[in-house]
């Protein structure tokens, strides 16, 4: 069974301020690229509704794994924890949008097209000890689209939103968090590579990079670290599906939810060798027998959805521009 949503024409996905040609909300400055997180929530209900309408026996589904666009993330506020939990505790919610309407501390989800963080990237690189140092720690030379740059950008431009943020979730984590009704689930260490904050070899948040990202921000590195999720293997089960989805769509209470990963790490799962993807970005994924890092920073060191190391060369916006 396969199903996609025609987001341009589907009335269930209308009215979120999404520009179909650019695939982002109208930017407020050059290089800003954000999508409406409420669209992701509406799309999940729409997709599961279509799945149920197709006649699929949802009760027979034993586990769900997901992929989300790499680097994209959302900022959740104080109300998020109880709102997500309500999906477990109250099976009779009207819909996901209603249940989660007050969750977001910031109304946009910055995505991989972000290109307005040059100053933030240079700041983080310098504070970490320079190009060689940040590559050695994170496996990447802090590209503009990486979440570390965006967190600093948001904190400087929208300090109230940053202060109100309690949890930062990558888009790959948002969907499984909704499915289990828990916004404190782990982030897989594969997609954490695309944040620019994880120590690549240790597979933990890097304290030096945290200090660099949060330098001069309220609460410093301690406050930023508190907003980030714990890290886990990409195949970690983060719980069973929430009561809302059992009642509304017929899933079994035993259906397990996997923490998921980014779209690139999950694509790499398809090949044990190298993989060339000619999508919205042109990417070359090169298998590595160990956690190897390109000291020149031309490639990004990552892990795939099975936890295997690989290097990732990217021509951003490939098919959109060529």
Explain the meaning of each model-derived region:
Residues 13-16, 239-241:
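Short acidic/His/Gly/Ser-rich catalytic and metal-binding motifs that mark active-site loops
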Residues 1-12:
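N-terminal basic/disordered segments at the start of proteins
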Residues 27-38, 42, 46-322:
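Glycine-rich phosphate-binding/catalytic subdomain of phosphoryl-transfer
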């Amino acid at each position: 069974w396969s199903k996609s949503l025609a987001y341009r024409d589907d009335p269930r996905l209308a009215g979120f301020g999404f520009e179909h040609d650019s695939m982002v909300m109208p930017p407020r400055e050059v290089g800003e690229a954000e999508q409406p997180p409420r669209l992701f929530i509406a799309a999940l209900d729409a997709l599961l509704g279509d799945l149920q309408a197709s006649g699929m026996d949802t009760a027979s589904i034993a586990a769900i794994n997901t992929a989300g666009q790499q680097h994209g993330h959302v900022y959740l506020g104080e109300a998020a924890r109880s709102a997500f939990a309500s999906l477990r505790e109250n099976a009779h919610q009207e819909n996901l949008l209603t249940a989660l309407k007050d969750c977001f501390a910031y109304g946009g989800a910055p995505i991989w097209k972000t290109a307005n963080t040059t100053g933030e990237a240079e700041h983080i690189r310098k504070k970490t000890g320079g190009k060689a140092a940040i590559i050695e720690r994170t496996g990447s030379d802090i590209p503009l689209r990486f979440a570390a740059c965006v967190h600093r950008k948001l904190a400087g431009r929208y300090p109230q939103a940053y202060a109100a943020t309690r949890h930062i979730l990558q888009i790959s984590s948002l969907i499984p968090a909704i499915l289990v009704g828990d916004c404190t689930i782990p982030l897989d260490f594969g997609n954490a590579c695309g944040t620019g904050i994880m120590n690549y070899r240790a597979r933990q948040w890097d304290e030096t990079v945290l200090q660099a990202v949060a330098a001069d921000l309220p609460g410093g590195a301690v406050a930023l670290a508190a907003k980030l999720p714990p890290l886990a293997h990409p195949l970690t089960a983060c719980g069973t599906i929430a009561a809302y989805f059992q009642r509304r769509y017929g899933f079994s209470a035993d259906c397990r939810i996997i923490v998921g990963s980014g779209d690139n790490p999950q694509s790499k799962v398809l090949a044990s060798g190298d993989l060339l993807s000619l999508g919205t970005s042109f990417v070359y994924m090169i298998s590595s027998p160990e956690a190897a890092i390109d000291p020149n920073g031309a490639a990004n060191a990552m892990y795939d959805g099975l936890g295997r190391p690989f290097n990732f060369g990217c021509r951003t916006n490939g098919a959109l521009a060529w």
